[in-house]
């Protein structure tokens, strides 16, 4: 269920991400600006779903004691589902910047960071999907 929610969010993000070219970010184009607004919002949504829903579901499956976000991220790193805890702390900070609208004076820089970080979220969701499939296969035998 959490993975399905994550996949729907990832599909929406991928749809928007595929319309953007890194070198065009910062151009004065109303259509591009609208697409970039959708990109940042969808990025923040997927990051939120991964940390608050998908990763928490993994914690439950692992019967782990991980209440704090840092503990959750450490567990995900130990399981090989994320590249590093530090990277995800940066992603969480990026999401907070989007949601709380900090750094709006340099919106193109923020949008470039989101564009470049999007594949990390997509890879992570795929890794968690593989993990879930292996857990399901292990429990059915």
Where are these regions (language model features)?
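Solvent-exposed interaction patches of small proteins and small membrane subunits
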Residues: 1-141
């Amino acid at each position: 269920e959490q993975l399905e929610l994550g996949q729907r969010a990832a599909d929406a993000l991928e749809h928007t991400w595929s319309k953007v070219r890194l070198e065009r970010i910062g151009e004065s184009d109303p259509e591009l600006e609208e697409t970039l607004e959708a990109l940042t919002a969808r990025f923040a949504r997927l990051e939120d779903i991964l940390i608050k829903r998908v990763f928490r579901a993994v914690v439950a499956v692992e019967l782990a004691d991980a209440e704090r976000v840092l503990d959750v991220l450490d567990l995900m790193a130990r399981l090989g589902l994320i590249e590093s805890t530090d990277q995800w702390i940066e992603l969480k900070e990026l999401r907070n910047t989007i949601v709380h609208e900090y750094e709006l004076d340099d919106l193109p820089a923020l949008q470039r960071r989101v564009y470049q970080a999007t594949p990390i979220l997509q890879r992570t969701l795929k890794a968690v999907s593989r993990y879930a499939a292996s857990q399901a296969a292990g429990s059915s035998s």
